[in-house]
Amino acid sequence: MSTAPVRYVLGGRFDLVEVISEGGTSTVYRAIDRIGLWAREQSPEVAVKVVQPNGKMRQKLVQLLHREARLLRDFVHQNLVRIYDSDYDGKYHYLVMELLNGRSLAHILADRPGQPLSPSVSFHIVRAVGQGLAHMHSLGIVHGDLKPENIFMTSTGEVKILDFGTALMPNASPRHDRATALLDQIGLLTPAYASPQMLRGEPRAESDDVFSLAVVAYLALTGTHPYARLPADEALKANLTPAVPPTISPAQWRVLASGLALNRRDRIETIGDFVQRLARPHWFYRWCGQRMPLSQN
């Protein structure tokens, strides 16, 4: 059995129109929801992720796909891509999601290698992603794999978090949590964005998402990775220290540096605190007399 062909109808409902992206384990399609079309919904288009039927570790990936749907289908937030459902039609396991038009942050940064985004755009991204993560945390879920590839900038200016396959409940013991064990077997973490604690397999905490968001913020503000793309556990052993970005105030750097802390005890604990202190509006700096970022273009 090969990858689902374009024009295949999943479950008698989702007409696969075109391939959006294809990876080693799954393919994402733009699809038409026939029920939505018959109901004359304003937009019957959806995105559908299909697990490749003969891919490596297929059975474990299938478990993660359906688990992602169970965890996230009731989550509704403007900064989280909407997960509608998952199913199996006898041939293919698939996940149905909100269809987005735009580009990932990874693609945007790739078009300008080594060049930063403006502070205003960077902080807009940080605030939006932070709001989405804070909503997840309020419902007891840690994302676990935040990176530019999983941050989407829509054509209307919205920012959405994607890909919740690594999402877990915080403080679950890896020895007793089946989802954690499954993730460890598949190895879905991205070393350049995961905290040292996650790389060591320690129980998840909200501050792990703080670390990942801080790395993304630093990358957006400077065009470079704070630890030269080394895994965080190696950066810790090497005692690396990020350079201070020239476009933010000393107060903002103290907050960002705390988010980038390799030791969990030195890191800001919650996303809300991190975002509130790092990405405060411009008037705050004028009011308290702190130096504003040098560029707001």
Regions flagged by a language model, labelled:
Residues 90-104:
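Conserved short submotifs of the Hanks-type protein kinase catalytic core
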Residues 106-117:
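AlphaC helix of the protein kinase catalytic domain
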Residues 52-74:
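AlphaC helix of the eukaryotic protein kinase fold
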Residues 192-287:
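C-terminal lobe helix-coil module of Hanks-type protein kinase domains
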Residues 86:
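Activation-segment/catalytic-loop signature of the eukaryotic protein kinase fold
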Residues 125-126:
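Activation segment signature within eukaryotic-like protein kinase domains
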